[in-house]
């Protein structure tokens, strides 16, 4: 698999340490780091009404689609190695990625 880039929606096993038994969960690639590492952000279909949750639906995808309306959770960041990624399901629009990235930045700057 080609290394995903920022803005891609990927599927990973969760918990991340056991791909064979983990549930498959979507995540948004926030940054493609040097080497094999990626910074990802959790995506959930559970409703979240906190200051950071960013709504996501199929109209926010420039490529691919999501199964149901969801929320991107910028306060739920984690790093994984590329080999953990099962596959890519799409890519968010530049506008949606910018919206999420601005929320991520406020975690560190505000």
Per-range role (PLM):
Residues 1-110:
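Conserved functional hotspots at enzyme active or ligand-binding sites that engage polyanionic ligands
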């Amino acid at each position: 698999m080609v290394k995903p880039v920022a803005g891609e929606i990927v599927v990973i096993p969760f918990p991340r340490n056991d791909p064979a038994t983990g549930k498959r969960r979507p995540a948004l690639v926030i940054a493609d780091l040097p080497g094999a590492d990626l910074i990802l952000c959790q995506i959930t279909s559970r409703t979240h009404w906190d200051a950071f949750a960013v709504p996501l639906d199929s109209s926010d995808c420039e490529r691919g689609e999501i199964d149901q309306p969801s929320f991107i959770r910028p306060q739920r960041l984690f790093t994984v190695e590329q080999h953990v990624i099962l596959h890519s399901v799409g890519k968010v629009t530049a506008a949606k990625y910018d919206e999420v990235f601005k929320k991520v930045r406020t975690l560190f700057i505000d």
